[in-house]
Amino acid sequence: MLEIDLNQLKRDKTIVREVGVEPEEFDVSRFGFCLSSPISVNLKAYHANNDALTVKGSIQTLVEQECRRCLKPVESKMMTKLDLHFTSKQALETSEKIEEELQFDWSQGELDLMGYLFQEIVLNIPAFVECDQSCRGICAGCGRNLNKLKCDCPEKATDPRWNVLLKNSNK
């Protein structure tokens, strides 16, 4: 768990934490990638008054995804910044601020950041990765990896309606 002790934060005004979170803490399989190393989290939490607190830091881990062309597993480094601004529930009750703002309650004693960490990881993963810029992918006809084997499938004939455009592209 990744929690900020609100009583300590209220007393010290600032908390700095460096933690490693195991990848098993997050079920990201439904998003098409997996975390292949512990997540390194560096945080600095601080507050200037009783109405708001800020958590800033960085997240770093290794991510394994499939190449978008040949489906080979590709491991890449993911680094992102964390910048969260929370408003106390008491301050939201007395103001006209939007209720969808990140909230905290001093009386709870701690602020759990795991959900926010999960969200930042999922939102910052690249949608597509390639094992190599020159990856040739897989054959649409037979499914062979064209990086390893030559395919004997015949080239599909182009629809004759495209011929006019093909003539113009060769000029």
Show where each model-derived region lies.
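Structured interface patches
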Residues: 1-171
